[in-house]
Amino acid sequence: MSTLRLYTKQALSISEQIELLKSRGLNIADSSKTAKFLGEVSYFRFVQYLRPMEADKTSHQFKPNSRFEDAVALYNFDMELRDLMFKAIQRLEIALRTKIIQEFSLEHGPFWFFDTSLADDEHKFIENMNSIDRELQRSKEDFIKKHRRNYDKPIFPPAWKTLELASFGTLSKLYYNFCDKKLKKRVARQFNLPQHEVLESWMRSVTVLRNCCAHHSRLWNRYLSTAPQMSASLRGAWVNIEGVDANKVYAIACCIAYWLDSMGYGLDFKNKLKSLLASYSQVDPTAMGFPENWISEPLWR
């Protein structure tokens, strides 16, 4: 076990940060532009994009010919990648929310989400209700205020009002814990997925990705903690999953592309991702789990 020690590093001024990078062998062509950039993007955030250029991970000395502008390009790529992913997730989230509310409410009534008899796990049911209650209490939406002025029972507004406020994570947990497997499968089939377990897996992974994008976290070479289920065969155009690292960006990008294909929006997402990768020659797609001939896979053609 390593020995804990006192943290002694002090804050550095921007000029000191620049001198530190230069002393480690980083080529900085324009110190004034570098200072402006580091005044807008913190050194601690940006250093993650410098790591691939390091020759020594202990001394943090850079490889020969390492350039500040290449790390900036990687940072900009990552920002555009997050934007692309987040916009796609928003479309998926709204569609999924619509399908769940519509199908479940038609089958089990407008208040199905707080019917304990429809839950697999009572403890998770209570957790979900507490989350929904907190989200409702925080809400400033006019439609909730109007509902409260006119109705006092049941305790929650109907699903199509309440679940418009629920986070994607809460919505996903409601779906996971819903006991009507036949109905869950019906929702999954509307996204061209064979079983609800596959949809549940993708929802979990998309929730992690969504949080990463929403908090502006590094994405490009990230190891995503929750891997989507990469089924060997799906009804639509798919990919060869052999050797695919399900915890990398490529895997979840495949799931998003397939999901969007089922809704008729996949081509736009795929073209934008291809264009983004082509625009940044400095970026190594293999660091994101992209196989060598990924663009030839049926899903991406």
Identify the role of each PLM range.
Residues 1-208, 220-301:
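Extended intrinsically disordered or low-complexity regions, especially N/C-terminal cytosolic tails and loops
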Residues 216:
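Acidic/aromatic/glycine-rich contiguous surface patches that form carbohydrate-binding/processing clefts
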